């Protein structure tokens, strides 16, 4: 077939993800760190929390299942997230730290502190740190039965 006569060439428009920023300007994101005793999630969103920028878990960084919640896996996940944030122009983070909560444990898992530390060491500025663990006002019954867990 012969080429068409009235065909116009469209110019490709360069689309960049993330906010348009000037040099030295601080752009905030929100890092949601969910540290249970089985895994650690490091999830960075924009300030509204609706747009995900990057999400990495400890299980994505290590091979063995037993190491998913380890501080080392959390550190690798946080470094990965920080690198992605920098490439998209986010220079500072507010931290929302969460444990399992509800009628389960209210203490964060072993990866929480190392994930937070890794974000701080990767030249990301830290804004506010907030604990958003769900605390029940009156909960459903906890597992373990009347006499509790017997070892």
Swiss-Prot record:
GO (cellular component) term, any one: ribosome
Gene3D superfamilies xrefs: Ribosomal protein S11
Region annotated Disordered, chain positions: 130-151
A GO molecular-function annotation: structural constituent of ribosome
GO biological process: translation
InterPro entries found in the cross-reference section: Ribosomal_uS11 (IPR001971), Ribosomal_uS11_CS (IPR018102), Ribosomal_uS11_sf (IPR036967)
Record key words, sorted: Ribonucleoprotein, Ribosomal protein
Extent of Basic residues compositional bias: 142-151
SUPFAM superfamilies: Translational machinery components (SSF53137)
UniProt cross-references to PROSITE patterns, sorted A to Z: RIBOSOMAL_S11
PANTHER family hit by this protein: 40S RIBOSOMAL PROTEIN S14/30S RIBOSOMAL PROTEIN S11
Family: Belongs to the universal ribosomal protein uS11 family.
Protein name: Small ribosomal subunit protein uS11
């Amino acid at each position: 077939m012969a080429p068409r006569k009235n065909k116009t060439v469209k110019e490709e428009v360069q689309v960049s993800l993330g906010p348009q920023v000037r040099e030295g300007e601080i752009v905030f994101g929100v890092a949601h760190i969910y540290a249970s005793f089985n895994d650690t999630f490091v999830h960075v969103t924009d300030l509204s929390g609706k747009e995900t920028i990057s999400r990495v878990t400890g299980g994505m960084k290590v091979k063995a299942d037993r190491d998913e919640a380890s501080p080392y896996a959390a550190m690798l996940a946080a470094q990965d997230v920080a690198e992605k944030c920098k490439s998209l122009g986010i220079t500072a983070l507010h931290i929302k730290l969460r444990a399992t909560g509800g009628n389960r444990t209210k203490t964060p898992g072993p990866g929480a502190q190392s994930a937070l530390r890794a974000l701080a060491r990767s030249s990301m500025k830290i804004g506010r740190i907030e604990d958003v663990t769900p605390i029940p006002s009156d909960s459903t019954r906890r597992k373990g039965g009347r006499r509790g867990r017997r070892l």
